């Protein structure tokens, strides 16, 4: 079991000394499920990237804003948001640490089962 608070504080310390203003650690990897803590210093932006099939962002510290085509909401400590299913980035409005939860793929057998269940009649 990981202490997310301690991990987030450690990564924020690393981000402050990083030339790129960020630090991250993947703390859970189970099949298609990934969870990582990402720390960013104020003003640091993660460039736009593709979204996995399902993902959420939980802000542990600070404030962030999702960026991209449609813009995005500002999120503050304690808030959780589902990530949009479109290219997006992340901007730290102040020093911040977030937990990214992502499902990176769905096994083919599960996709077939879901597709069959969604097909009428």
Please identify what each model-predicted range represents.
Residues 1-32, 67, 114-121:
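A short, N-terminal "cap"/entry segment at the start of jelly-roll beta-barrel domains
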Residues 20-21, 31-51, 85:
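Conserved short histidine dyad/triad with adjacent acidic residue
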Residues 44-46, 62-67, 80, 88:
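Short beta-strand segments in beta-sandwich/barrel cores
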Residues 52-69:
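Glycine- and acidic-residue-biased ligand/ion/polar-headgroup-sensing regions
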Residues 60-61, 76-77, 94:
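A cytosolic small-molecule/anion-sensing beta-strand core signal
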Residues 69-85:
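Short acidic-glycine-tyrosine-enriched beta hairpin
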Residues 85-108:
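Ligand-binding loop in jelly-roll beta-barrel domains
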